[in-house]
Amino acid sequence: MKSNKKSNRLRAIYRALVIAIGLAVIIVFNYFNRKNNNARSSRRACSCFFSLTGVNLEKIGTFDTDAKLIVLNHQSLLDIIYLEAYHPRNICWIAKKELGEIPFYGHALTDTGMILIDREDKKGIVSLLKACKEKLDQNRPLVIFPEGTRGKGGEKFLPFKQGAKIIAEKFQLKIQPMVLINSIKIFNSKPLEAYKARTRLVMLESYTPDFNSPTWYEELQERMQKEYLKHYHELNPSEQ
């Protein structure tokens, strides 16, 4: 038991170093490449995480390059790495303003033209919608975590916040839902943990919701939750 705990700790430290050093290198390349499609080519180097750590990301489904809004659950820093590594488009993340203010590492967001929102600003929704329109006009798909913060990686999602709903309805967007399973087991920063586990990205079929339906957003959450549970139980049979 103690040896397993030590092994998990060492694995977590190694993966943290890979992320920290790898991201630092990517940020430097992003700076020089920032005017070229928001440094999308250098951002793809996130895929090196998998070869350097031996992690195999199982992918089910396909990316819909016509989808304008991507919604996915949030468990780990790796969720961003997963999509940055493999999504074919110049995606634009919607993130908390505080993340862009982190010394040096905040440049991963600011140098690449991501949307940073101030949750304390009462006019924040106006600024958010203005920024979203700008990115959509640049033909950049938007990516948002509807839970608003990291979940604990168990069976249940956190309640979806209204941000994704407001954006989708305002611009009548085609949505591609995605679910991530076990990314928190591959790397968890608080507490620092990493396990040998299978991890999976499931890309659901995209669609344009019936925005006249008052329940479309709840139905989206139910659909994602159902799909997540199916794969969660498949990858974690001992937890049923």
Swiss-Prot record:
UniProt-recorded name of the protein: 1-acyl-sn-glycerol-3-phosphate acyltransferase
Topology with respect to the bilayer: Peripheral membrane protein
Pathway: Phospholipid metabolism; CDP-diacylglycerol biosynthesis; CDP-diacylglycerol from sn-glycerol 3-phosphate: step 2/3
PANTHER family per the UniProt record, alphabetical: 1-ACYL-SN-GLYCEROL-3-PHOSPHATE ACYLTRANSFERASE
Coiled-coil regions listed in the entry: none
Top-tier EC class: transferase
Presence of keyword Glycoprotein: no
Catalytic activity: a 1-acyl-sn-glycero-3-phosphate + an acyl-CoA = a 1,2-diacyl-sn-glycero-3-phosphate + CoA
GO CC annotation terms, alphabetical: plasma membrane
Example of a GO biological process term: phosphatidic acid biosynthetic process
Domain notes: The HXXXXD motif is essential for acyltransferase activity and may constitute the binding site for the phosphate moiety of the glycerol-3-phosphate.
Entry GO MF terms: 1-acylglycerol-3-phosphate O-acyltransferase activity
Gene: plsC
The keyword Lipid metabolism is assigned to this record: yes
Extent of motif HXXXXD motif: 74-79
Signal sequence extent: none
Location of this chain's protein in the cell: Cell inner membrane
Pfam families, per database record: Acyltransferase (PF01553)
Summary of the function given for this chain in its UniProt record: Converts lysophosphatidic acid (LPA) into phosphatidic acid by incorporating acyl moiety at the 2 position.
Keywords: Acyltransferase, Cell inner membrane, Cell membrane, Lipid biosynthesis, Lipid metabolism, Membrane, Phospholipid biosynthesis, Phospholipid metabolism, Transferase
Gene source species: Helicobacter pylori (strain ATCC 700392 / 26695)
Enzyme Commission no: 2.3.1.51
Main location: membrane
Stated family: Belongs to the 1-acyl-sn-glycerol-3-phosphate acyltransferase family.
